[in-house]
């Protein structure tokens, strides 16, 4: 019964985690059922599409065939790029798919014909001719219910707040930012906007308005899907406080003490995972107090199940402000919840959605602004042929970073030459941005605070962003190349194969160590010591007092030092290059964007290109070619999740 699954697995159409589920379904469906094989193949297609982030599939033959055909084309292109394609097997997949994706079989996926696996308490649920795993159907219903109860309420606060009374003379909010403050006093809001549009800025002034004019003792939670994104939100709020006048701060010491001491949370840390049951301690039955304010950032990164868990833990009278960029990539896991919220007719009608469209990071005369705007509108990219340079002309440009220029370098048609191109460019990049890190990170003096700051800033000067993790265009291959080129292997540490100067990123939430997915830092050694430490800039609950502690976690200023041996080596990765997904919520002074080099690749799409280029604060280098870039911009990633249907 799993022949089709094995074929898809061999050709990278599906992940192996579905094997057990399909075996369980096979056991639950009677062998006497005439069409069992075709139904099993349909369920296999569904799981394959879940791997792409969908939560549901249509039981309409025409719609499903169109969706599946796009996946076949995309995976085939990816296999060609990696030189792993077997055309005869792709043809076999097409033939088997054409047989099972037929209305006569699709119409049998219902509670009557398949009562053993379809129904309210079974593996699958069918709703309005769409098939869901029960957990996704449950999550979408909980989200719709929570949005209904949290975003239809009006708060009758008769507050007349003028932000100008608390800011310095040279500070202004845009009209849309002022609308956020004014509306947010009496409504919960969804706020969308690109980088530099001031989402966090206007929410800070909204917070000031609510705290200044209320006798409620609010519990305020800064929440994001990753540790990095949560830290960035706290940093953004702290930096925006510089716009507030000292006079106003002195008049409202208690208010600003609250804001200064706000804590940031990943969603997992906020909801508290029970170590025994692996379930969240905060949930529908045990909610946060109603005098709570939730500021949720990078919402596009939150998957459907996590979004559901977060919203159901919030009481009706709570204040909720959800922020994100509608044009960024959706979550790594299934769903596209933030996008669905922005399309909600109820939220639009009720005035809960505000889009900020004035960027203070990218002025309208910059190349980045023009390219990002064209990408989002799906426009034809107009650029002169001489814009695309040969890779041998690659160099680190010494230009005015405020102009955010873009430099384009092109692939050729040969795979072997493209590998050489990537290595050639990464060699120059590493010499500029990573080689000096090795000296700076070896034998550091903890009393030299300036050196710590310089080291951390150096690690952020240049970042390589890749669409994929595997393959010669992928972050893993690039990271290994740069490590072998840069590290000094004569400097041994107490952790095998780990050396000072390596840029690293945490890939798993670790509550015990207070390290979270997305936390990034550098491996360092101290004077006269071979102990390797992971140095990361973050606040932490587990170590709040300054001072060196031998062989233990310690804090110096804004930096935490973790003995690297405390961190499981499968929980931390090299991060000279990271995937574009991982880069969400971050920005870097200079970026090198390495795109897939085949048209039709599943990771060559509008959202991934937009997300990548908007991580820059300065120079952007793109490795692709004109046709690849245009085709990627034309390909908009669409996920089926049907939250409000």
Per-region residue spans from a language model:
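Residue-level signature of catalytic and energy-coupling elements of molecular machines
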Residues: 62, 143, 266, 297, ...
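Interdomain "pre-motor" coupling segment immediately N-terminal to P-loop NTPase/helicase cores
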Residues: 84-159
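ASCE P-loop NTPase helicase motor core
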Residues: 178-181, 186-399
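Conserved helicase motor core of P-loop NTPases
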Residues: 327, 331-504, 510-513
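C-terminal accessory regions
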Residues: 519-645
């Amino acid at each position: 019964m799993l022949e089709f699954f094995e074929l898809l697995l061999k050709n990278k159409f599906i992940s192996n985690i579905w094997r057990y589920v399909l075996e369980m379904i096979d056991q639950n469906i009677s062998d006497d059922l005439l069409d069992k094989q075709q139904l099993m193949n349909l369920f296999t297609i569904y799981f394959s599409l879940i791997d792409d982030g969908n939560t549901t599939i249509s039981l309409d033959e025409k719609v499903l065939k169109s969706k599946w055909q796009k996946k076949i084309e995309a995976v085939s292109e990816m296999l060609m790029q990696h030189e792993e394609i077997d055309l005869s097997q792709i043809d076999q997949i097409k033939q088997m798919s054409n047989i099972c994706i037929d209305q006569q079989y699709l119409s049998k996926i219902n509670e009557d014909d398949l009562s053993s696996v379809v129904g309210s308490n079974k593996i699958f649920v069918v709703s309005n001719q769409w098939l869901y795993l029960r957990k996704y159907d449950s999550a979408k219903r909980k989200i719709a219910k929570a949005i209904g109860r949290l975003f239809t309420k009006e708060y009758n606060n008769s507050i007349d707040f003028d932000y100008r009374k608390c800011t310095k003379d040279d500070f202004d909010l845009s009209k849309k930012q002022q609308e956020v403050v004014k509306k947010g006093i009496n409504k919960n809001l969804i706020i969308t906007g690109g980088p530099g549009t001031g989402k966090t800025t206007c929410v800070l002034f909204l917070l000031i308005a609510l705290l200044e004019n209320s006798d409620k003792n609010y519990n305020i939670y800064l929440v994001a899907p990753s540790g990095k994104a949560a830290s960035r939100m706290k940093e953004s709020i702290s930096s925006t406080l510089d716009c507030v006048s000292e006079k106003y701060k002195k008049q409202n010491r208690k208010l600003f003490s609250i804001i200064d001491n706000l804590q940031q949370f990943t969603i997992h840390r906020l909801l508290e995972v029970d170590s025994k049951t692996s379930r969240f301690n905060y949930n529908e039955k045990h909610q946060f107090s109603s005098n709570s304010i939730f500021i949720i950032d990078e919402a596009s990164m939150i998957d459907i199940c996590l979004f559901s868990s977060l919203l159901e833990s919030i009481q009706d009278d709570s204040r909720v402000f959800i922020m994100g960029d509608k044009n960024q990539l959706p979550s790594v896991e299934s769903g596209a919840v933030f996008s669905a919220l922005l399309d909600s007719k109820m939220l639009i009608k009720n005035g809960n959605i505000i889009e900020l469209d004035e960027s203070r990071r990218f002025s309208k005369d910059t190349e980045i602004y023009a390219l990002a705007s064209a990408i989002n509108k799906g426009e034809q990219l107009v650029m002169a042929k001489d814009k695309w340079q040969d890779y041998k002309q690659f160099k680190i440009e010494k230009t005015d970073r405020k102009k955010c220029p873009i430099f384009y370098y092109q692939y050729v048609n040969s795979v072997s030459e493209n590998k050489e191109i990537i290595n050639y460019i990464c060699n120059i990049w590493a010499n500029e941005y990573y080689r000096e890190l090795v000296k700076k990170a070896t034998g550091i003096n903890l009393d030299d605070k300036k050196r710590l700051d310089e080291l951390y800033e150096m690690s952020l000067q240049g970042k390589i962003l890749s669409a994929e993790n595997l393959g010669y265009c992928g972050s893993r291959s690039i990271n290994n190349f740069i490590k072998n080129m840069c590290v000094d292997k004569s400097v041994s540490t107490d952790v095998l194969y780990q050396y000072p100067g390596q840029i690293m990123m945490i890939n798993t939430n670790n509550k015990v160590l207070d390290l979270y997915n997305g936390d990034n830092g550098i491996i360092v050694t101290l004077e006269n010591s071979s102990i390797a430490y992971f140095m990361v800039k973050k606040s932490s609950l587990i170590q709040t007092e300054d001072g060196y502690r031998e062989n233990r976690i310690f804090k110096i200023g804004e930096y935490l030092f973790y003995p690297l041996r405390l961190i499981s080596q499968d929980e931390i990765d090299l991060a000279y290059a990271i995937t574009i997904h991982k880069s969400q919520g971050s920005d870097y002074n200079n970026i090198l964007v390495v795109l897939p080099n085949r048209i039709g690749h599943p990771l060559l799409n509008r959202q991934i290109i937009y997300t990548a280029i908007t991580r820059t604060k300065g120079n952007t280098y793109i490795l692709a070619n004109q046709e690849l870039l245009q085709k990627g911009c034309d390909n908009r990633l669409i996920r089926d999740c049907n939250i409000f249907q």
